[in-house]
Amino acid sequence: TLCGAMTQDIDERAKINTSRSVSAMVAIGIINIITVPLIGKLGSQSAKTGYLLVAIIYGCIFAACHFFCFAKTKEQVIMPEKEKISIKVQLRAVMQNRPYILALIGQVLFGFTLYGRNADVLYYFTYVEGNASYYTTYSMCIIIPSIIGAACFQPVFRKLNNKGRTASIFALLTGISMLCMFFFNVKETPAAFYTLAGITQFFFSGFNTAIYAIIPDCVEYGEWKTGLRNDGFQYAFVSLGNKIGMAIGTALLAALLGKYGYVANQVQNPAVLSIMRHSFTTIPGVLWIVTAIVLFFYRLNKKRYNEIVEDLKKNRVK
């Protein structure tokens, strides 16, 4: 909810979300590189001790960053004072918020696709490619594209003036790139495989920035449409949608692997290998294209948003 309270300027919100995503990708890249060596250094006598100490260090850094953010950030948007509103009333309000509904559907698909594929990635490299260590190379290849992709959201948005359409384009290109990965593998075509992995991550990072940049603008639209401003509820509800997608995606993968005879640390049968391969490439690829189609219908562009903000300011003055 913090981004929506810091500014109502749609371009400033785009900058804030871009900075957040780029910083997150940089942090993820650093963590991916240093975590295993750090565990080995701190847990020279016991891996268990190493994991514990690294978790404590990361937890302290995480808490310190949150306290710093709390202390140094100011809310600039004046929130209307109102009495406590029931969940029923808030649900009725968000159901009238068409841009938000599209963003919510996008988040459910996002959670389903992203976490379902993430749950499959180690299975894919271990059993389909035959070597779990390939995952390390894969992780290294996607770090830089992740950072650049996140930074590219803002210039694409400036060109299109529509965050939903921007997210749609990134989702479409993510899906196409992921579908192309089906035709390559690490053993026979490593250069093409890792190149496509980087391209896929580039487009995904742009989408990841765009989808979260949409939500604050939906809050203003909802207030204009219904007279009710409920930042916290909308953020919580969209987060719930993402988690529901995550739960379904990961559970479905586990159920399919179990049904078709997956046995840990053994040679897998062709059906299981096929599930692992398609869950890494074609299935998420198709779902990303579906996500792109959904978000294509997001029509709250920059011009319309600015008109809504002006209406809200006039109404508050009255």
Predicted region positions:
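Intracellular loop-helix junctions on the cytosolic face of multi-pass helical membrane proteins
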Residues: 1-132, 279, 284-318
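Intracellular juxtamembrane helix-capping segments at the cytosolic ends
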Residues: 1-8, 206-226
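Glycine-rich segments within core transmembrane alpha-helices of 12-TM secondary carriers
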Residues: 17-38, 62, 139-143, 237-257
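Juxtamembrane helix-start motifs in multi-pass secondary transporters
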Residues: 54, 162-169
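Hydrophobic transmembrane alpha-helices of Major Facilitator Superfamily
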Residues: 112-116, 202-210
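Helix-to-loop junctions at the C-terminal end of transmembrane segments
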Residues: 148-165
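C-terminal ends and interior cores of transmembrane alpha-helices
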Residues: 172-188
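Helix-loop junctions at membrane interfaces in 12-TM secondary transporters
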Residues: 183-197, 207, 212-213
